[in-house]
Amino acid sequence: MARSGPEVADIFRRYGEAYRAQHTSLSTAQRRVMTAIELCRTAALGGHVEACDQCGHRRIAFNSCRDRHCPRCQSLARAQWLEDRRAELLETQYFHVVFTLPEAIAAIAYQNKALVYGLLFRATAETLRTIAADPRHLGAEIGFFAVLHTWGQNLLHHPHLHCVVPGGGFSPDGTQWIACKPGFFLPVRVLSRLFRRLFLEHLEKAFDGGKLQFFSDLRALNERNAFRRYLAPLRKAEWVVFAKPPFAGPEQVLDYVGRYTHRVAISNNRLVDIEDGAVRFRWKDYRHGDRQKVMTVSTDEFIRRFLLHVLPEGFHRIRYYGFLGNRYREQKLAQCRDLLGMSVPAPSETQAPKEYRDRYEELTGRSLRQCPACHQGQMITIEIFDGVTGPPRCWDTS
């Protein structure tokens, strides 16, 4: 069903051309994202015509852009990802741990996205695995996945990782499952201190290797002593690592995680209106009791904030570690189930790839085949047409 409210695409279509003309320093990736969202589900990308085999009702369906930054193109990808993860759930506690970069580091990250976001993943993974392996804490090999978000509710740059961690892991010899204490994963202060040290070590090494670049108000940091002075107060500051209460059970993990995995900077349902060159959107003010508020910004400022969160092309924002790492996941999960006394899941049946509409209905519970007019007939494709201008040259769906 088509939305009746404002969408990010509406803002880009009305004001995007002027914004691009005024901001010539936009990256190729940012321009491609804007174009993809503007053309999404329009005649420019082509589509098909369907007709009901009972009442003759017709509808035109335009193709989507499939870009991972597009608010309209995430539902099927999210549903497919969650379905894939469902078979991997273990009968144990699950914890949600968030690692956040300080504002001063976030400024460096914005000018060096691929490198610094990669260091965020690396330092987080090393921190969790090191503390979990320490016999003073858990003494086990754990597994987890991490999801990168780069925004806060106000759409400003706020890079942080959401980590979902089963509450336990293998003993050093791999013969036992060592469970966390009920309701407690690992000490947050210990995690925070190690995370701070590891991240700063990796960042300094990157600087020494000539891998960091600084521009505009950070240009002075290209000089070694200035860079070290910039980092000095961060060595003593408290870095935010937040462990949320454990999930009620494995199934609740998927319900919760589904809110995070394929989220974009702002969803269309948070937009209130677009009037007189201004955008109003809903946001939650976490600093004042999670109060729901409405923020008004100019269309230029809205576009600027949205584009802050365009990821480098090919950058993986969901990553897996430990016994959930891609290489040995099936083997390690089988070992987990055995140690936890879980039944062996039935092997999936080999079958031909399903047609898009079948996959959509299976994963979302909503039918694209049923006629929306008579609710009796099936919608049959009677014509396929190409795009008017052709699709964007590059889709980033990673």
From Swiss-Prot:
GO molecular function annotations of the record: DNA binding; transposase activity
UniProtKB keywords: DNA recombination, DNA-binding, Plasmid, Transposable element, Transposition
GO-annotated biological processes: DNA transposition
This protein's record includes keyword DNA-binding: yes
Stretch forming the signal peptide: none
InterPro entries: transpos_IS91, Transposase_32, Zn_Tnp
Family of this protein: Belongs to the transposase 32 family.
The protein's name in its UniProt record: Putative transposase y4qJ
Species in which this protein is naturally found: Sinorhizobium fredii (strain NBRC 101917 / NGR234)
